[in-house]
UniProtKB/Swiss-Prot annotation:
Domain annotation PDZ: ranges: 517-589
Domain of life (superkingdom): Eukaryota
Protein name per UniProt: Tyrosine-protein phosphatase non-receptor type 4
GO cellular component: a single term: cytoplasm
EC numbers: 3.1.3.48
InterPro entries on file: Band_41_domain, FA, FERM/acyl-CoA-bd_prot_sf, FERM_2, FERM_central, FERM_CS, FERM_domain, FERM_N
Phosphoserine: residues bearing it: 474
Similarity annotation: Belongs to the protein-tyrosine phosphatase family. Non-receptor class subfamily.
Source species: Mus musculus
Domain FERM as annotated: residue spans: 29-312
PANTHER family for this protein: TYROSINE-PROTEIN PHOSPHATASE, TYROSINE-PROTEIN PHOSPHATASE NON-RECEPTOR TYPE 4
Disruption phenotype: PTPN4-deficient mice are born at normal Mendelian ratio with no apparent developmental or phenotypic defects. They display normal cytokine production and T-cell effector functions. However, they show impairment in motor learning and cerebellar long-term depression.
Length: 926
């Protein structure tokens, strides 16, 4: 049949073209994309196209080079779990409702270091994302950090502070955090004045550098339910999977510890590695709202693991039978990994590009009226298609007069209760069965609404976790069944001891309030092997923060688990006792006649599964490929376990939280000698004094010097590294310093500061210039040589005792690369320096003298680092907090700031991962 026929007037009508035009109109859809500058751009695409087509159009519109960090998130998803547009699936299968479709352009993968982003424009997009997330309460932020971040944002937009232009109230048109306090602007203005000279790019870089330290930075949350029908949050991030309940982080599962992630129907499973001290595999199970939410979480885990942990994505199945006849999902992340993205950025990025920044708009993304946007977007002149040329990033009109407020729940500690991940003892015949009454789920914007607060916010703090969407549906209690027998009566049991029910055990479940009685005795060193955090003074329940492998806490039955809440200690209610009191109660158990510690805990309920598999294999599973780190020192179990815990603590922030809780001065230690009138002038700082019990005594009538002995014993070896930690000499204490050096027989001095930093004298020059000699009382010091590099200096000296007519050779090593403020950006130079110190002291028994300015901060960092290296060489686990505690037992305040502690922890992890120091077959050398 021909498509053309002749009309009487001699004209033609093209039927086929009309049919195609009609079909094209039916298959083209409009997609409204909310960009990070709060503008909406409409694009027209074919609904049969893959998602990658729409992504490419958006990337082209933004002229974005480093694309793999970003994605499109469905704005009108009806679940509480965010869904990303899959680039490999047709658009019509992902966007079910009618056109126009609404999506948010967002950062999908948050890098751990902004230096990995090669283009300033990419960092600007990150900056917009985080700023918006903090403003809407999606990303919680302490007020002091929020003020710092806001000051960098102001510097980026307004430039340098100008007293004549930036009058009082110049920030009144801006909103930075939910429920912004009245004095918040003053704090921002004060910090803004300190950023003079920073360009917009530098200010934004500093913004990202500060934001990456936030607890919830880069965490993608998915809502789930526990066995008691309580809400929990499952967070997916670069380092692994987090579990939150009642706004308290309950568990962290690093990719290092995960063997497999899978799901079946509405059940999501995490299978953990079997450790050497464990007898059974561990399988964790979680209930999701529906099948799609479960698969969404699973895909998020696959994508995050592949992007951050692998060098390249796994290749697709090439075998015909393996591809078409295997059960489960064939989904694989196929974009670039972080390693590939960084390399691509280095090769393709245009670091000199110029773009226009958008002025701030206080309106939040959640206030976007998608209905109005949808109506406006249907106008043809507002559409872009893939045929349009690329544009420069769109500008934005100034709307500073707008205002934004948002209800936010106040951050409050909560009783942890028991986190029922419903991990249960299960035989192969058992299966998960969940039941739910039919219900509807309210459609909401992907930007989560804040739930009504039960308390009036007092401090303007944003919520600790993303605010929960309101929902109409309600979930019924989830039951587990074994054949015809209902197991609901057993769901409150806290531990399933593998013995006959007739036999009683010394430990076991208490029927009331789901409590568990745990008994243990200390090891030969008087330790139980667990740490706790919280207390009445911290307004937090007392929670078990760490259980060391192979210790009494780990081996007792029932086992004490991380996340368990301690209710009673030896029958004593600790609800109104401080953290230090709780620790003393635990330690006092070692001194009692029975020597037994009895704990009543509300369990975290992470239990082992008898069998690895269910009745049938899960429908979808993902077995993470091993990253290079996984294969390091596999045989050194205890050492490897401690490194995993350290990496986990750095990611989650528990490392710094535990450091903050550690006493700065050991209880019961006195410092009376330092406060005697004749000694006060010998202290560089009024509040930094040596313990009386461990101070170095000089011979003679005036025996005082601000210095302490510090001995660090390395277990399973004969090594005891001896140090003298002291302050940097003052002009009138140089004689005392050299007297101490002579009397202690020290042949090496380690100096960790320059003489002047930021205009302040940190240490007097207590040695002569090269080829010169100087006298200090009865001691003459001659400097023979001075060599070095930009990071450190070696000086060879002779110390001559004029009274005894004796001389000794000594070496001074000075580290000069420590910045005036903060800590080094890279630990490489410092680690080289520590290695040189170790080489110089090899075979020497006498103590080495270590000092900075106060003799506590950088001095503590060096001692911690060398101790950790020795522990690694001896195949011993490394727990930095224990090292700091040992040092503070001998000199107060060792390692002065959290940034110093984080620096040394990261350096220890680097030494282990990169093989800087390796376990030795013998441990005779220091």
């Amino acid at each position: 049949m021909t498509a053309r026929f002749r009309l009487p007037a001699g004209r033609t009508y093209n039927v086929r073209a009309s049919e195609l035009a009609r079909d094209r109109q039916h298959t083209e859809v409009v997609c409204n994309i909310l960009l990070l500058d709060n503008t909406v751009q409409a694009f027209r695409v074919n609904k049969h196209d893959q998602g990658q087509v729409l992504l490419d159009i958006v990337f082209k519109h933004l002229d974005l080079t480093e694309r793999d960090y970003f994605g499109l998130q469905l704005a009108d998803d009806s679940t509480d779990n965010p869904r990303w547009l899959d680039p490999n699936k047709p658009i019509r299968k992902q966007l079910k409702r009618g056109s126009p479709y609404n999506l948010n352009f967002r950062v999908k993968f948050f890098v751990s270091d902004p230096n990995k982003l090669q283009e300033e424009y990419t960092r600007y997009q990150y900056f917009l994302q985080i700023k918006q997330d903090i403003l809407t309460g999606r990303l919680s932020c302490p007020c002091n950090t929020a003020a710092l971040l806001a000051s960098f944002a102001v510097q980026s937009e307004l430039g340098d502070y100008n007293q004549s232009e930036n009058l009082a109230g110049y920030l009144s048109d801006y909103s930075f955090i939910p429920n912004q306090p009245q004095d918040f602007e003053k704090e921002i203005a004060k910090l803004h004045q300190q950023h003079v000279g920073l360009s917009p790019a530098e200010a934004e870089f500093n913004y990202l550098n500060a934001a990456r330290t936030l607890e919830l930075y880069g965490v993608e949350f998915h809502y789930a339910r526990d066995q008691s029908n309580n809400e929990i949050l499952i967070g997916v991030m670069s380092g692994g999977i987090l579990i939150y309940k009642n706004r308290v982080r309950m568990n962290t599962f690093l990719w290092l510890k995960i063997v497999k992630i899978s799901f079946k129907c509405k059940q999501f499973f995490i299978q953990l590695r079997k450790e050497l001290h464990e007898s059974r595999e561990t399988l964790l199970g979680f209930n999701m709202v529906n099948y799609r939410a479960c698969k969404t979480l699973w895909k998020a885990c696959v994508e995050h693991h592949t992007f951050f942990r692998l060098d390249r994505p796994l290749p697709p199945q090439k075998n015909f039978f393996a591809h078409y006849f295997t059960l489960g999902s064939k989904f694989r992340y196929c974009g670039r990994t972080e390693v590939q993205s960084v390399q691509y950025g280095k090769e393709k990025a245009n670091k000199d590009r110029v773009f226009a920044r958008s002025p701030s708009k206080p309106l939040a993304r959640k206030l976007m009226d998608w209905e109005v946007v949808s109506r406006n977007s249907l106008s043809d002149d507002r559409l872009e298609t893939q045929s349009l040329p690329s544009r420069s990033p769109p500008g934005t009109p100034n709307h500073r007069n707008s205002s934004f407020t948002q209800e936010a729940t106040r951050v409050r500690p909560s009783s942890v209760g028991h986190l029922v991940d419903h991990v249960v003892h299960m035989s192969p015949s058992e299966d998960f069965v969940s039941q739910r009454s039919p219900s509807s789920t309210q459609a909401n914007s992907i930007v989560l609404e804040s739930s009504p607060s039960q308390e009036t916010p007092e401090d303007g703090q944003p919520p600790a976790l993303p605010p929960k969407q309101s929902k109409k549906n309600s979930w019924n209690q989830i039951h587990f069944s074994n054949s015809q027998q209902d197991l609901v009566t057993h769901t409150n049991e806290s531990f399933d001891v593998p013995s006959s029910p007739e036999k009683s055990t010394p430990n076991g479940g208490i029927p009331h309030d789901n409590l568990v009685l745990i008994k243990m005795k200390p090891d030969e060193n008087g330790r139980f092997g667990f740490n706790v955090k919280g207390g009445y003074d911290q307004k937090m329940p007392v929670i078990v923060s760490r259980v060391a492998p192979g210790t009494p806490a780990d081996l007792c039955v029932p086992r004490l688990n991380e996340g368990d809440q301690v209710v009673l200690i030896n029958g004593r209610d600790i609800a109104e006792h401080t953290h230090d009191q709780v620790v003393l109660f635990i330690k006092a158990s070692c001194e009692k006649h029975s020597g037994e510690l009895v704990l009543l805990v509300r369990p975290n309920a992470v239990y082992d599964v008898v069998e690895e598999k269910l009745e049938s294999e899960p429908d979808f599973q993902y077995i993470p490929e091993k990253a290079p780190l996984d294969s390091v020192h596999q045989d050194d179990h205890s050492l490897r376990e401690s490194m995993i815990q350290l990496a986990e603590g750095l990611i989650t922030g528990t490392v710094l939280a535990q450091f903050d809780q550690l006493y700065r001065k050991k209880p019961g230690m006195t410092m009376s000698c330092a406060k005697l009138p004749q000694n006060i002038s010998k202290n560089r700082y009024r509040d930094i004094s040596p313990y009386d019990a461990t101070r170095v005594l000089l011979k003679g009538n005036e025996d005082y010097i601000n210095a302490n002995y510090i001995n660090m014993e390395i277990p399973s070896s004969s090594i005891i590294n001896q140090y003298i930690a002291c302050q940097g000499p003052l002009p009138h204490t140089c004689k005392d310093f050299w007297q101490m050096t002579w009397e202690q027989g020290s042949s090496m001095v380690v100096m960790l500061t320059t003489q002047v930093e930021r205009g302040r004298v940190k240490c007097h020059q207590y040695w002569p210039e090269p080829s010169e000699s100087s006298s200090y009382g009865c001691y003459q010091v001659t400097c023979h040589s001075e060599e070095g590099n930009p990071a450190y200096i070696f000086r060879k000296m002779t110390l001559f005792n004029q009274e005894k007519n004796e001389s000794r050779q000594l070496t001074q090593i000075q580290y000069t690369a420590w910045p005036d403020h903060g800590v080094p950006d890279d630990s490489s130079d410092f680690l080289d320096f520590v290695c040189h110190v170790r080489d110089q002291r090899a075979g020497k028994e006498e103590p080495i003298i270590v000092h900075c300015s106060a003799g506590i901060g950088r001095t503590g960092v060096l001692i911690t680092m060398e101790t950790a290296m020795c522990l690694i060489e001896c195949n011993q686990p490394v727990y930095p907090l224990d090292i700091v505690r040992t040092m503070r037992d001998q000199r107060a305040m060792m390692i002065q700031t959290p940034s110093q502690y984080r620096f040394v922890c990261e350096a220890i992890l680097k030494v282990y991962e990169e093989g800087f120091v390796k376990p030795l077959t013998t441990s005779s050398n220091k």
